Amino acid sequence: MELTRAKHIAFFKRHLILFPTPYEEHDCERTVLAFFCLLGLDLLNALNTIDDDDKKSWIEWIYKNYVTKESKGIKYSGFQAYRTGIQPISFEQEPQLAGTVFSICCLLFLGDNLSRIDRDLIKNFVELCKTSQGHFRSIAVPSCSDQDMRQLYMATTIASLLDFSLSDPLCSIQYIKSCQRYEGGFSLLPYGEAHAGATFCALASWSLILKMIPNSSLNTSNQSYNLMDCVPKVERLIRWLASRQLSSGGLNGRTNKDVDTCYAYWVLSSLKLLDALPFIDGGELEKYLLLHAQHALGGFSKTPGEFPDVLHSALGLYAMAYQDDKSFPKVNADIHMTSKYINICRDCIQAAKGK
């Protein structure tokens, strides 16, 4: 069974024009859905098949979700995942970490140079989302209860893309450590269940934080720039990640759970960050994805027999890219983009700094 590349390209392009009924409950997350469509096309080397007028129109739509606010004399800005309705953004509608990181990625995919965003105000927004325990809320409102490892990952990704450092990064590392479970994997919150998605967010955040802080801050017996040397119980962690692969070749995200296409991405990315990718049988995983997750109409499904969706389709392709650098562009492990667009982002930020 081969990758039906043309069908996958058509699948993502269809969804960029119109999302089917099953996506209705995710209407407030349109930017996130658009990101997975654009990521999928980038992995298939097909972003150039999007019409230039469409790209310009979508860029303008994304910037309509950019909002600047003020709290206690501090101005901050960021993106919403989707501004609902036709009225201007109200004061009650806050920018979100998810909306901000996925909007930045979409703008890069569409060829924007990020010149209309204010890095300093976005940095203020990220810092206002931070808690005293080192993790982050999804919005800059102290009463927000949406705060876990995912928000920490989005905050560190925003900081990395826009080239600024987080305050007190070592506190965030301590929070990550507090979420490691006895199996070696990480949970979304302290004392939770080890989960492959949370484990990726923990390791990727840790990796990005290590790149932000000076070497002098790491001169302790237990810390270094090598993630493998930093993570406690690393052998147990690798064993737990490797055990996510089942006899079908697919991967699950938690102990005693069924396979799910997206965990191919979360697990392989985690192992890649630990230089331990060979612990997964890539051939069996690819066979599973192509035979059981790939859909006849294009795209990949969450589990065999279900309809495909853009998230599982993009992440399934990303997992395959780790195993095949000839058919796919080079991918990045700690930020969910191809290396090409990570470099483009750095060039955009350096150009903005030079003005």
Curated annotation (Swiss-Prot):
Q: Give UniProt keywords alphabetically.
A: Magnesium, Metal-binding, Prenyltransferase, Repeat, Transferase, Zinc
Q: Which GO terms describe its molecular function?
A: CAAX-protein geranylgeranyltransferase activity; zinc ion binding
Read off the SUPFAM superfamilies from this record.
Answer: Terpenoid cyclases/Protein prenyltransferases
Q: Which GO terms describe its biological process?
A: establishment of protein localization to plasma membrane; protein geranylgeranylation
E.C. number(s) listed in UniProt:
2.5.1.59
Q: Where does Zn(2+) bind?
A: 260, 262, 312
Q: Which cofactor does it need?
A: Zn(2+); Mg(2+)
Gene Ontology CC entries for this record: CAAX-protein geranylgeranyltransferase complex; cytosol; nucleus
Instruction: Mark the PFTB repeats by their residue spans.
Output: 119-163, 169-210, 234-275, 282-324
Q: How is its cofactor bound, per UniProt?
A: Binds 1 zinc ion per subunit.
- Which InterPro entries does the record match to this protein? GGTase_I_beta, PGGT1B-like, Prenyltrans, Terpenoid_cyclase/PrenylTrfase
Signal peptide residues are none
Enumerate the residues binding geranylgeranyl diphosphate.
195-197, 254-257, 263-266
Q: Which reaction does it catalyse?
A: geranylgeranyl diphosphate + L-cysteinyl-[protein] = S-geranylgeranyl-L-cysteinyl-[protein] + diphosphate
Record-stated family: Belongs to the protein prenyltransferase subunit beta family.
Q: What does this protein do?
A: Catalyzes the transfer of a geranyl-geranyl moiety from geranyl-geranyl pyrophosphate to proteins having the C-terminal C-A-A-L where A is an aliphatic amino acid. In particular it modifies the GTP-binding component of the 1,3-beta-D-glucan synthase.
Q: What is the protein's quaternary organization? A: Heterodimer of an alpha(cwp1) and a beta(cwg2) subunit.
PANTHER family associated with the record: GERANYLGERANYL TRANSFERASE TYPE BETA SUBUNIT, GERANYLGERANYL TRANSFERASE TYPE-1 SUBUNIT BETA
Protein name as catalogued: Geranylgeranyl transferase type-1 subunit beta
Gene source species:
Schizosaccharomyces pombe (strain 972 / ATCC 24843) (Fission yeast)
Q: What is the lineage of its organism?
A: Eukaryota, Fungi, Dikarya, Ascomycota, Taphrinomycotina
